[in-house]
A protein has these predicted regions:
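Long, charged, low-complexity intrinsically disordered regions
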Residues: 1-49, 53-114
Length: 114
């Protein structure tokens, strides 16, 4: 779990996002591979706060409101919860609206052990 003070600082953008991964246009398998590499690389560089942009899904009729179903926004949280990646992660959740909302995931990584 994440400290409420830290979460407040993240939401208010008082803590800088160290790195961003944009998965727009990627297939599921490619996205999983890119996320694994992104998490591991940022952990090794001791980057703590990162953002993964999944997108919100295809728009199926904007005139009728949002009807998109994003495959990646369903799959990537499962990937982050995996045994392979969970050891690097303290916390993750969908980003606040001012950072992409449900089309992006904020991830707070553990400190690198040296």
């Amino acid at each position: 779990l994440i400290d409420k003070n830290l979460l407040s600082k993240i939401i208010k953008r008082k803590i800088k996002i160290n790195s961003v991964l944009d998965l727009h246009g990627c297939k599921v398998n490619e996205s999983k591979t890119r996320v694994v590499n992104f998490i591991k690389n940022n952990y090794e560089m001791n980057n703590r706060l990162i953002l993964i942009i999944t997108g919100k899904g295809k728009r199926l009729g904007v005139e009728n409101g949002w009807k998109g179903k994003g495959v990646l926004k369903e799959v990537i949280p499962q990937c982050l919860n995996s045994v392979l990646l969970s050891r690097f992660i303290i916390w993750f959740d969908f980003a606040p609206k001012n950072m992409g909302g449900e089309g992006a995931i904020l991830v707070y990584l553990k400190k690198t052990i040296k």
